């Protein structure tokens, strides 16, 4: 019996709308609809794997290489002091890297934030794209 698709699989398959920063044949980068920090993004491999250490080496290396590309763009786009990363899979059982742009004077508290409008997410995505 096939398990029901996760929300990330539905987004990847374009069954649920999302604001995309980047997409290729291996991964997507999305603006987080419920950010703990403004400008938070998600790097999600297209292959549905629950636990980061269950990824094959190629996909593991790829999502971290993608984080290395996205992080500096976020740093510039949001004038961040640092861009922090956290690999997760708790709320959605599909590996994803959460990228948090942390600005001067801010601290990072890990939680699911309030829903943000698509207009704000599109604006933020375009800022990041401008530095890729």
Language model features by range: what are they?
Residues 1-132:
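HIT superfamily nucleotide-processing domains
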């Amino acid at each position: 019996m096939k398990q029901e698709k996760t929300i990330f699989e539905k987004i990847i398959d374009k069954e649920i709308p999302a604001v995309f920063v980047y997409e290729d044949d291996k991964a997507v980068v999305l603006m987080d609809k419920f950010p703990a920090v403004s400008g938070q993004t998600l790097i999600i491999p297209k292959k549905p794997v629950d636990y980061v250490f269950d990824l094959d080496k190629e996909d593991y290396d790829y999502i971290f290489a993608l984080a290395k590309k996205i992080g500096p763009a976020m740093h510039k786009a949001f004038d961040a002091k640092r861009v922090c990363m956290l690999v997760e899979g708790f709320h959605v059982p599909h590996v994803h890297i959460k990228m948090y742009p942390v600005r001067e004077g801010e601290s990072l508290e890990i939680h699911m934030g309030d829903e943000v409008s698509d207009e704000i997410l599109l604006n933020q995505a375009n800022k990041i794209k401008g530095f890729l």
